[in-house]
């Protein structure tokens, strides 16, 4: 079977007895099982230890990230599928937090175990489409940031990305309208009308930036126990720190790392092999290349050219001076590269 390895992983998870579900982007499960996008699993918080033990037993490795990518109640795990030759990335959530990028300060207070079902096409437990649609509406509303560069440049009607449109269309065709109304009445009573307003705007293709800001305000003010907003001063400071440290973002795995050396004569394929491996691993991990051969760039070329010119003109001391600078430049470049290198191990 095409996805036999990842299918077996989920069979083990299903048989473990640990409550979990895939709670978002279930329209894209075919892409996830092919190893081309991530899985987002919501796991019972009381079963964390058992679930993590099973992941390690199955060959997963926990991926760590710098502060800018750390979110409350979420961990990352990687699994190499040698059948597909892909790295599967699992986002493991122990509570449902969402919100603006880098912030994620809104907690959805709901017992997901009441709403889990088996997917019809893949061996995975998913959240029922009515809850997924409600969550997608709330995520879309509160992810909107008027000050984001994309929205400032648009200055017009708000537009959703294609992947989100695909999710909305899939869910709107999959939901049971009566079930949807029952869930909204019982679990989202205080904000159900705002959720319905957004769905109506989506169906009429009339989602405006003003409408999104209005919905953010109304839901925040009208919310009962469905959502919990973290707006403390300390949390705002954490958001500011994340924003400032994003440029230093790094991903690594728990077991440390490994240095892979490629040695060979010119033309043996070292560069192409390194590029292929670097591209593959960089999809999920921070990897740096350290070149120990002759540095060839514009500065080195210019210094060598000046050395050659003065040598031709019989100014040997000046020529040697520039040759010395070539050596210093190459050495400094290698030191700089060595400090940047992140060691990885798979």
Language model region names:
Residues 270:
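Conserved lysine of the Walker
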Residues 295-346:
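ATP-dependent small-molecule kinase phosphotransfer cores
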Residues 276:
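Active-site signature of alpha/beta-hydrolase-fold catalytic machinery across serine-
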Residues 284-300:
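Short beta-strand-centered segment that lines the nucleotide-binding/catalytic pocket of NTP-utilizing
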Residues 265:
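P-loop (Walker A) phosphate-binding loop of NTP-binding proteins
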Residues 262:
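Hydrophobic anchor at the beta1->P-loop junction of P-loop NTPases
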Residues 1-39, 43-258:
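Conserved NTP-donor binding/palm subdomain of two-metal-ion nucleotidyltransferases/polymerases, i.e.
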């Amino acid at each position: 079977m095409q996805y036999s390895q990842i299918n077996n992983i989920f069979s083990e998870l299903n048989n473990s007895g640990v409550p979990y579900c895939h709670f978002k982007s279930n329209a894209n499960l075919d892409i996830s099982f092919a190893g081309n996008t991530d899985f987002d699993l919501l796991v019972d918080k009381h079963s964390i230890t058992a679930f993590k033990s099973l992941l390690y037993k199955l060959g997963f490795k926990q991926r760590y990230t710098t502060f800018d990518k750390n979110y409350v109640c979420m961990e990352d795990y990687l699994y190499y599928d040698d059948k597909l030759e892909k790295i599967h990335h699992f986002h493991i959530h122990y509570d449902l937090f969402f919100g603006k990028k880098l912030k994620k300060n809104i907690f959805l207070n709901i017992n997901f175990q009441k709403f889990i079902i088996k997917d019809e096409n893949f061996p995975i437990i998913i959240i029922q489409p009515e809850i997924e649609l409600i969550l997608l509406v709330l995520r879309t509303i509160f992810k909107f940031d008027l000050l984001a560069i994309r929205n400032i440049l648009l200055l017009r009607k708000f537009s959703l990305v294609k992947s989100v449109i695909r999710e909305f269309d899939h869910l709107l065709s999959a939901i049971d309208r009566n079930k949807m109304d029952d869930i909204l009445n019982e679990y989202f009573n205080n904000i159900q009308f705002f959720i319905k307003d957004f769905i109506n705007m989506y169906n009429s293709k009339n989602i405006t930036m003003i409408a999104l800001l209005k919905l953010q305000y109304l839901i925040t003010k009208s919310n009962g126990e469905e959502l919990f907003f973290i707006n403390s001063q300390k949390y705002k400071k954490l958001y500011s720190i994340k924003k400032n440290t994003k440029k230093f973002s790094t991903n690594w795995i728990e077991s440390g790392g490994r240095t892979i050396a490629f040695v060979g004569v010119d033309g043996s394929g070292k560069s192409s092999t390194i590029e292929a491996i670097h591209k593959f691993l960089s999809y999920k991990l921070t990897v740096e290349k350290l070149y120990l051969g002759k540095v060839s760039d514009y500065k080195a070329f210019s210094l060598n050219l000046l050395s050659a010119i003065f040598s031709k003109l019989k100014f040997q001391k000046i020529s040697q001076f520039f040759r010395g600078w070539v050596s210093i430049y190459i050495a400094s470049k290698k030191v700089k590269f060595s400090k940047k290198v992140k060691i990885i191990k798979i």
